[in-house]
Regions:
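Sec-dependent N-terminal signal peptides of Gram-positive bacterial secreted proteins and lipoproteins
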Residues: 1-20
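Acidic, metal/ion-coordinating pockets
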Residues: 15, 19-380
Length: 380
């Protein structure tokens, strides 16, 4: 309150360089209404930060074999062109598609994945704060794979959501704090590729069940200023979401999610700014596609970083997403060698045919549902 009053006093007009006497000063002060102070708080006491999210970190065997060195696996040198755009963010969310169990659990690619421990170094290098581990590959190494992944992420100081090591872990709320603003995260997957959840271990992975999701949201919503929900579902390689998935995303939006992030199709699907019945807005990214993988079709090499400007007014407690930008990315490779993650805007330098046309197609596609999404070559 001291800072607020000082601001109000300094803002009072004393006129033509005259020194106001105590009476004038006192009279002016009493005329400052509660509404004025309220407006000052909302205008000048606001927290703003950047939040960014990506699609799938999908570590195929071709990818880890390509980066293998005498001392381990050097993923980091292959992402230097894009990593700085995440490192500059205040909060970063990524989708960790594969278990990180290391060589003790036998490394493997498709269809049952297990990545080297150095995949966690990659996430750390991206400056990931929290990753979703709710996907169809969560149980590729069963209980031990979930536990190993959680352990290595904990060692790196990276939070995880959507998979859990115990019933107590499943009850733990994933809340990240940025400058005093509380951001809650939930994550779910449609299934685990037919691998059954071990008996008595339902906590291992969060499966999509709308009643459960809405209940979880209700439990978390009042404890946070912003709520992000990640949904691992959809149809692989389809460029647009199906009606049933749109309906679920919109139901989650109406239940109070500020941002809904989609994963699993491995290709980009449009972003929408959904207008809720309460007058607010929810940003829905139906599929953020692959971010770093070894898939070879052009559409599966395209991904991106979605960036949000988040504003929180301390006076009212209102938190809003004011700006949404998308920077397209591209995974260059020479078939299954020399993988490198780059901005799509630079792909012509790496030999991508009709790179400008591809960039324009991605821009048009991502803006199919709303032109409020800004497409940028590089994040500033």
């Amino acid at each position: 309150m001291m800072k607020i009053m000082m601001f109000v006093l300094l803002s009072l007009p004393f006129g033509n360089n005259e020194v106001a006497d105590y009476e004038t000063y006192d009279k002016e002060l009493t005329q400052v209404s509660g509404e004025t102070i309220h407006n000052v708080i909302n205008t000048h006491f606001q927290t703003s930060f950047s939040f960014a999210a990506t699609g799938d970190v999908l570590i195929h065997d071709h990818l880890y074999e390509d980066v293998e060195t005498e001392s381990g696996y050097d993923f980091i040198s292959r992402v230097d062109e894009v990593a700085p755009y995440l490192q500059k963010q205040d909060l970063v969310f990524m989708n960790q598609e594969t278990p990180i169990g290391g060589e003790d659990l036998r490394l493997s690619g498709y269809p049952m994945f297990n990545a080297p421990l150095e995949a966690a170094d990659l996430l750390e290098y991206f400056d990931a704060d929290i990753v979703s581990f709710a996907n169809n590959h969560t149980l590729d190494r069963s209980t031990e794979g979930v536990e190993r992944t959680a352990d290595i992420l904990n060692e790196k100081g990276i939070e995880y959501v959507g998979a859990n090591t115990s019933p107590e872990d499943a009850e733990r709320k994933r809340i990240m704090e940025v400058d005093g603003v509380e951001v809650g995260f939930l994550a779910y997957t449609y299934g685990t590729n037919g691998i059954p959840v071990p008996e008595g271990e339902d906590h291992l992975v969060n499966l999509i069940d709308m009643e459960t999701i809405l209940s979880d949201m209700e439990d978390l919503r009042d404890e946070v200023d912003m709520l992000v929900v990640s949904m691992h579902q959809g149809v692989e390689y389809e460029p647009y979401p199906r009606d049933e998935h749109v309906a679920q995303f919109e139901q989650i939006a109406e239940a109070g999610a500020d941002i809904v992030l989609g994963h699993h199709p491995h290709v980009l699907q449009p972003v929408d700014i959904y207008e809720r019945e309460d007058g607010g807005e929810t940003v829905i990214a139906y599929s953020l596609a692959n971010f770093f993988s070894a898939q070879q079709d052009l559409d599966t090499k395209l991904g991106g970083i979605i960036e949000f400007d988040v504003n929180h007014k301390q006076g009212t407690g209102d938190t809003t997403v004011e700006g949404v930008r998308f920077m397209p990315t591209y995974v260059h490779s020479e078939e299954y060698d020399n993988f490198e993650l780059i901005p799509l805007a630079d792909a012509d330098e790496y030999g991508l045919e009709d790179a400008d046309g591809v960039y324009q197609d991605v821009s048009d596609h991502m803006q199919s549902y709303t032109e409020e999404l800004e497409i940028v070559e590089y994040l500033e």
